[in-house]
Amino acid sequence: METVNTAIQPEKTRRRVLLKLSGEVIGGGKLGVDPETVRAIAKQIAAAVTEVEVAIVVGGGNFFRGAELSQSGMDRSRADYMGMLGTVMNCLALQDFLEQAGVETRVQSAITMGQVAEAYIPRRAIRHMEKGRVVIFGAGAGLPYFSTDTVAAQRALEVHADVVLMAKSGVDGVYTADPKKDPTAEKLDVLSYDDALRRDIRVMDQTAMTMCKDNSLSMVVFGMEGEGNVTRAILGETLGTLVTP
């Protein structure tokens, strides 16, 4: 008689988050990588990884922005691939500082580059997180025309993250208008994706927001400024703006 394997996947017992860091954050607002900024971010992540499973998507805007390069006459696909390579450089920088902080880290790239990163395999990423490792996803989606916001939403869904954490520079959440231009702008503590889309509030790009909305994935938009904000966001403390399906 044939034996049927009825083993089921164990349910995750810890909170699992997907942290989205822009290239501008990694660069400290300048071109390239700002070591002190990345070191500070790594220490904040390290303070939370014993309690929470963490995956990270990193942008590449501190090196290249495909959309901007294409406006200057470069082929959009080629420009986007340059941006993807920029994200991998940021991943390696963050990996280095995380490991200096005592956190075992893996980089997974959507573009094969076996000497510096693993291939992107969702099941393997989940296993790494279950073992207490941080996983950093690089090279975007491995395809042109996809923003790293969209990649953050997609990766979060594929590794079964509980929430997407959007780290922002210069703003501490979502406002009714640009607070730098409109002094009457009010900060929103809670916002639905429907409201954000209807009012054209640019939390992240529309493709990413729609993906989160359709799959009931919540998001927290918070400011990088403030002592320990990255740690607090990872641990699930209330800060910034909660965007809900």
From Swiss-Prot:
Enzyme class: transferase
GO molecular function, one term: ATP binding
Activity regulation info: Inhibited by UTP.
Enzyme Commission number(s): 2.7.4.22
Keywords, ordered alphabetically: ATP-binding, Cytoplasm, Kinase, Nucleotide-binding, Pyrimidine biosynthesis, Transferase
Binding-site positions, ATP: K20, L21, S22, G23, G61, R65, Y175, D178
Keyword hit for Transferase: yes
Catalyzed reaction equations: UMP + ATP = UDP + ADP
Pathway in which the depicted protein is active: Pyrimidine metabolism; CTP biosynthesis via de novo pathway; UDP from UMP (UMPK route): step 1/1
GO cellular component: cytoplasm
Entries under InterPro entries matching the protein: AceGlu_kinase-like_sf (IPR036393), Asp/Glu/Uridylate_kinase (IPR001048), Uridylate_kinase (IPR011817), Uridylate_kinase_bac (IPR015963)
Binding positions for UMP per the UniProt entry: G60, D80, A141, G142, L143, P144, Y145, F146, S147, T148
Main subcellular localisation: cytoplasm
Keyword match Membrane: no
Domain of life of the organism encoding this protein: Bacteria
UniProt-annotated location(s): Cytoplasm
Family annotation (Gene3D superfamilies): Acetylglutamate kinase-like
One BP annotation, GO: UDP biosynthetic process
Role, per record: Catalyzes the reversible phosphorylation of UMP to UDP.
Oligomeric form and interacting partners: Homohexamer.
PANTHER family noted in UniProt: URIDYLATE KINASE (PTHR42833), URIDYLATE KINASE PUMPKIN, CHLOROPLASTIC (PTHR42833:SF4)
Membership in a protein family: Belongs to the UMP kinase family.
Protein name per its UniProtKB record: Uridylate kinase
